[in-house]
Amino acid sequence: MRNFEDLQIAVAGTGYVGLSIATLLAQHHKVTAVDIIPEKVEKINNRISPIQDEYIEKYFAEKELNLTATLDGASAYKDADFVVIAAPTNYDPVKNFFDTHHIEDVIDLVLSVNPEATMVIKSTIPVGYCRSLYVKYAQNFAQMEPCLLYTSDAAD
């Protein structure tokens, strides 16, 4: 049986979903949050929430967190046991289309530096998307769970 203590977890994306997951997991595991926006990374590393959420702000101020942030996805994913993908998937109502390229960019990078990592997609995705990833990558993904958080209760 796998030991789930002292895991190294990378979280791709630091919006409401990604940052709340990273913050909660960082209470018990080493977590590296990855984002492409330098200001967000700097704020997280200085324990300032880049998003307005009272719970995340409270956790940053009061909890012992093993959380760092980086712009370098490859270094974060290289030694990760799990990679939580919380990348944006913008929906275009005119085309009736979810833009999932950010998810696939993360998957491609993870597979190139750490093909043994377990990837968990937490981004909002269209029905059947995980099946298409399985066909494309011949990979098993641990979980598909669309985001259903209220914006003011990200860490609740």
Annotate each PLM feature.
Residues 36-82, 89-96, 137-143:
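Conserved N-terminal Rossmann-fold NAD(P) cofactor-binding segment
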Residues 97-148:
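Rossmann-fold NAD(P)-binding glycine/threonine-rich loop
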Residues 2-48:
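NAD(P)+-binding Rossmann beta1-loop-alpha1 motif at the extreme N-terminus of oxidoreductases
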Residues 87-89, 124:
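Short glycine-/small-residue-rich Rossmann-like dinucleotide-binding loops
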Residues 6, 80, 116-117:
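A general structural motif
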Residues 84-85, 121:
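Redox-cofactor binding/interface segments in oxidoreductases and associated redox assembly factors
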Residues 150-156:
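Conserved small/polar residues in nucleotide/adenosyl-binding loops
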Residues 10, 32, 68, 118-120:
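A structural signal for isolated positions on well-ordered beta-strands in alpha/beta enzyme cores
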